[in-house]
């Protein structure tokens, strides 16, 4: 009943959800125009964008550089930052793998953070390997390995990022350390 009630309360959100289910059928321009109207209730001004949101849509459509793909990849961007300003500004990486099953947990320290390289928000923090729930971590990360972040909002730099998992040094001072365990 919860989803049905949400759809009744906010029909635009229900339409947006249904629209995203057909996301592969639309050109980038068509998709962004329709999604923009659903979210903001007005037509997207592509020719002379004024608002921040319109300018972001314009950038998605017309400002494409191949280096952006390396910049959104959490593993590849470490190389760029190291080359440009030095490795002191990069959180140390313990490894990169194509699947969860390839991770060599015995070689990782007691505390670490696992992240997907190709999206935003898919991470798992391990504060103690003895208490680490590998099954839950695997379910969360592998679910996200099969998503292509590009399709939801047409942020094309994400389209060709190879989905992988990295292990990084756990840095509790960065952000909310208790948000995922």
Q: What positions do the PLM features span?
A:
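Phosphate-binding site of ATP-dependent enzymes
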Residues: 31, 108-109, 132-181
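Short catalytic/ligand-binding loop motif for oxyanion handling, primarily in non-cytosolic enzymes
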Residues: 78, 101-104, 120-125, 134, ...
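Membrane-proximal basic amphipathic "stem/tether" segments
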Residues: 1-63
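Acidic/histidine-enriched active-site and ligand-binding environments that engage anionic O-linkages
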Residues: 103-114
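A short, GP-enriched loop/loop-strand-helix hinge that lies immediately N-terminal to
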Residues: 57-70, 132
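Catalytic phosphate/metal-binding cores of nucleic-acid and nucleotide-processing enzymes, i.e., regions
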Residues: 94-98
């Amino acid at each position: 009943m919860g989803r049905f009630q949400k759809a009744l309360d906010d029909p635009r959100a229900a339409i947006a959800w249904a629209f995203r289910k057909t996301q592969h059928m639309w050109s980038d321009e068509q998709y962004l125009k329709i999604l923009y109207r659903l979210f903001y209730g007005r037509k997207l001004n592509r020719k002379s964008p004024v608002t921040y949101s319109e300018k972001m849509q314009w950038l998605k459509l017309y400002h494409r550089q191949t280096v952006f793909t390396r910049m959104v990849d959490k593993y590849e961007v470490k190389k760029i930052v190291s080359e440009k300003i030095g490795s002191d500004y990069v959180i140390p990486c313990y490894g990169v793998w194509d699947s969860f099953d390839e991770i060599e947990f015995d070689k990782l320290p007691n505390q670490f953070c696992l992240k997907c390289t190709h999206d935003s928000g898919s991470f798992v923090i391990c504060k103690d390997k003895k208490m680490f729930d590998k099954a839950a971590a695997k379910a969360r990360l592998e679910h996200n390995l099969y998503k292509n972040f590009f399709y939801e909002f047409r942020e094309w730099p994400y389209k060709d990022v190879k989905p992988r998992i990295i292990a990084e040094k756990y840095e509790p001072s960065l952000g909310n350390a208790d948000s995922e365990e």
